[in-house]
Amino acid sequence: MNSLQVLTKKVLIENKAFSNYHEDDSFILQQLGLWWENGPIGFCKQCKMVTGGSMLCSDVDSYELDRALVKAVKENQTDLIKLFVLWGAEINFGIVCAKTKKMKDLCIQLGADPKFLDEGLYNMFVYLVKQKKVLLAIDIYYDNILILDSFDSHDFHMLIDFMYNRFILNLDEKEEMTRNTLVLKFWYKFAIDFNLIKPIRYLSKKFPHLDDWRLKTAIYLGNVDEIHHAYFQENIRLDPNHMMSFACIHPWNKLGIYYCFALGADIDNALDILLRFDETNKEINRETGRGISLYIEWGYLSNVYFCIGLGANPYIKKIQDTIKQKNSNIMILLFSRKKRILSPHSVLQNKILDPTDVRKMILTHENTENFYPFSELAVRLIQQANI
């Protein structure tokens, strides 16, 4: 049962009793547990957001209710924990962050499942992925040694790798990372992939040392909104040809490839990168079924065709030398075009940088007549090569 003190706080906060507080009152409000971040605590019933001072629900620093609970548990703010649960926060998110027996007992008293730490972690991870709760997930996992150590090392990496269709670590070339860094980059990449603006802005503010990595990830995943924002609004700059190398290693990445091209990357060099990408077939054939292999390889062929549509010339000596050195389905495709039917596509010749216009242009390109015959040809060639 909640104390009269907690219920009183609930009524006062919901009625915005501290919206016009005086600076001299700040110390008293902090001592009474009515302070959040940089001002008196506020709560929006409609949005389920916890705010501080003049903060709005939409602000980057505002907290979803479950995140506020996790923060309160980490800071041992007992009354706030009770208050947030009263508003509807999921107390099981709190127990996984409790560092002391006293705090765990409080969470159990408030309704947490005592077995959650043993039986609920996998389901929690899946829930956070499905609901795209990026910031909540980072609040729970980041620097939470108890939770990170509860995962078997192999299973932990396999779980994250599987949840991201096996491309989660490609950008970092499967370098050795601490579990903390792996968790952070997984969820950061997740936010960029789904273009979750608030999590991206919050994480970019909190982890500025990852700015270059963020731009590379946006390129790799073809998030032109984030590329545009990072490049032009935050002035995060990399050499366009270096950026193109990241765009090329992800299948079906027309948006990423085009944007690097529009920024000045050499498109012939991009085609050469694709043809020299030895890891393509290794990744395709490692632990994948034939159906998945076909889909991924078709995605790389799509990148090759798209580069040619942008003006890359597959018949110049540099590319022909690469073709002679390699033996893959991509080469079979190019060898089959000796009549030089492949040529630049008129729709793609204007270099534009507005993300909305870029998406419209790519959609127009995909809806043109000469795209689909090529796709059918690519499938037949791959199927013949895999027999």
Curated annotation (Swiss-Prot):
GO BP, sorted A to Z: taxis
Family according to the record: Belongs to the asfivirus MGF 360 family.
Function (record text): Plays a role in virus cell tropism, and may be required for efficient virus replication in macrophages.
Protein name: Protein MGF 360-4L
Organism: African swine fever virus (isolate Pig/Kenya/KEN-50/1950)
